[in-house]
């Protein structure tokens, strides 16, 4: 990556933009986002060079790269974009990615995004934003392929070809009647069927879905359990309102695991990345638990002081104290690691507190 950074830096300074364009056009969007992160404020001191590189990307690749960037870079670029460039990014972006961007941006940036959105896009954005932050509705997309049960396989393929280019996924299609979800069918099922077969005869009617207000952590658990590529989201009347895709579910799982690690390490969860969190925020996330641990250490010291006479009589006992305390700390670290792993794999829940305590305090038949 560093060699690529240096090469692009050199070519831009030499104004060999065509060569730069040929280099970046074949790169993966996620890799380009990492590249821009390295460039942001480091290799390029000039904002114009940063913008030149972004403008050399093809429109579709630029939009996908933009979606992978962190909020600081996105805000920086939007403030430098013309209205046409914002419009181009929105045209190539999925609605759920646009919503993610809006949620991270300051008010002045949000107003520019909404100003350059179409009426349909604003309606879709507002529809997702009205759901609670940690709900399934807040992470779904409304860009899915909907089929009718009376369609034939050939008609279904015709519709997929017609509307699929603007959908986030076309592998899993959803069969609806009066907006109500009645079946699910995959492209594989369609390929394996005859052209004249009816969708109603080959669709899967045993549907696993999630309510719009369900906690997004539950959505992550369902993806982990059922290996979904996409999960339908329905309202209380079983009307299909959107889908959660695999990439968004993975973000939820990563956030959940980060939160679990923070809690087990006695640190208040923080949504910002490590290097984008200031020293005062780092201190704020730790100070409460540090005070609690300090109080517990004080209690330990009080107990130790009560046996001061014993230590005076047998000084050798003092030499064992650091060893015993370190061993206890190491044992606690090992136990917390196992607990974190169990939580991450959904083997342990907070309701299992007493069950875990019993496991550590009593012998098990499995030990024999």
Could you tell me what each predicted segment is?
Residues 248-282, 333-358:
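Non-transmembrane, extramembrane segments of multi-pass ion/lipid transporters
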Residues 280-344:
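Core alpha-helical transmembrane segments of integral membrane proteins
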């Amino acid at each position: 990556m560093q060699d690529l950074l240096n090469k692009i830096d050199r070519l831009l300074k030499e104004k060999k933009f065509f060569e730069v364009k040929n280099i970046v056009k074949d790169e993966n969007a996620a890799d380009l986002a990492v590249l821009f992160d390295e460039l942001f404020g480091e290799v390029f001191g000039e904002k114009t060079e940063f913008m030149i590189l972004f403008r050399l990307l093809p429109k579709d690749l630029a939009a996908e790269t933009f979606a992978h960037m962190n909020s600081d870079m996105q805000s920086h670029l939007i403030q430098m974009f013309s209205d046409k460039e914002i419009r181009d990014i929105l045209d190539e972006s999925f609605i759920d990615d646009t919503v993610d961007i809006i949620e991270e941006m300051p008010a002045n940036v949000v107003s520019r995004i909404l100003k350059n959105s179409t009426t349909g896009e604003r309606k879709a954005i507002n529809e997702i934003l009205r759901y609670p932050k940690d709900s399934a509705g807040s992470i779904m997309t409304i860009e899915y392929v909907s089929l009718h049960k009376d369609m034939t396989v050939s008609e279904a393929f015709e519709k997929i070809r017609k509307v699929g280019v603007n959908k986030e996924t076309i592998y899993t299609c959803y069969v609806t009647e009066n907006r109500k979800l009645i079946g699910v069918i995959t492209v594989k099922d369609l390929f394996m069927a005859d052209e004249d077969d009816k969708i109603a005869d080959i669709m899967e009617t045993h549907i696993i879905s999630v309510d719009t207000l369900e906690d997004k952590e539950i959505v992550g658990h369902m993806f982990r359990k059922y290996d979904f590529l996409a999960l339908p989201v329905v309202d209380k009347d079983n009307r299909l309102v959107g889908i959660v895709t695999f990439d968004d579910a993975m973000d939820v799982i990563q956030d959940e695991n980060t939160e679990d690690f923070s809690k087990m390490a006695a640190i208040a969860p923080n949504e910002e990345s490590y290097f984008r969190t200031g020293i005062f925020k780092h201190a704020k996330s730790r100070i409460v638990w540090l005070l609690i641990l300090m109080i517990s250490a004080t209690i330990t010291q009080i107990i130790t002081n009560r046996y001061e006479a014993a230590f005076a009589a047998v000084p050798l006992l003092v030499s064992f104290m650091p060893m015993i305390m370190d061993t206890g700390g190491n044992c606690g670290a090992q136990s917390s690691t196992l607990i974190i792993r169990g939580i991450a794999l959904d083997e342990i829940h907070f309701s299992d507190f007493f069950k875990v305590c019993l496991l550590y305090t009593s012998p098990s038949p499995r030990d024999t």
